[in-house]
Amino acid sequence: MPTSPLTPQITTDFDPFQEPRREDCPWCGSRRLRTRVRAPDPLRHRQGTFALDRCRDCGHAFQNPRLSAEGIAFFHRDFYERHLDELTARVLSPAAVRRRHRTTAWRLSALHEPESWLDVGTGHGRFPEAAKEFFPYTSFDGLDPTARVEQALREGRVEEAHRGYLATPGMAARLHARYDVVTLFHHLEHAPDPRAELRAALTVLRPGGHLVVEVPDPRCLFATLLGRRWLPYGQPRHLHLPPLANLRAELEALGCTILVTDRKHPHVPYDLTAAVALSLAPAPPLLQLAASPLLDVAAALDHVLAPLFRRTRFSNAYRIVARKQLTP
């Protein structure tokens, strides 16, 4: 089947980029599903739309049909990553990202002085780079499914680079009980199997170690108001969006003690800005330039209203800090 390297054209009913549609919730098994949103690839590298379903019983949101391994690889290529970074930079500046990483690291300084730390979904290693200011004696390693983690190693932002997912066969066994802290910042939504990723995270943690998970909140009111223009829906790359209650229950079932649940500080003030940027993404460059003042207005509203949003159901993310049990 002939394809373009950028925009594959599917000429049969079989789509190699998607698995068969499932009729039950991957989290609780319920068959009471509702399509929450249908959204196109914002970069238009592929035709069609991607659907996100929500379970009426447990609230888990998930891509359905889900990307296949081939589809996941396509949407994590370096070429796609660079173009996505350009779109994201219109919503959240690199300086804002650096400030956010520093603030997050500062808030985790209560973890004292861990010897070793694995940042999962590290990308270019920007969080470890920022965290070294507050944890100067900690060894930071990075894990990511893309080649960005190898660049982070070359540029000295991580001490070891691991390519893949925690649940990649052999990964957890190789890193067994090596780390005092494992962080998964906006990584779990990209994982094909979030539960397997959590189990693997606990495998690489030492007894008594800390697991920090931050995920977009599918119950955020912006998700309802903005629909497919709510950035954390993240189609086609976001595969799962578990609500806080589900993730907390899963970690407790795995024997963890929940130390912190936080909806306030993980909120990122970009919902309105991102909605405008996604609306303008398919427009010609001249129209995007002419409409740039709209982005400025939206950004101002996001930041002015952030103190209110982060204290209400408009908060767009949550964080859980859990401690692994000391004995098996």
Regions found by a protein language model. Give the residues of each.
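Conserved SAM-binding loop
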Residues: 14-17, 21-22, 100-226, 239-253, ...
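Residue-level "edge-of-site" marker
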Residues: 68, 165-166, 264
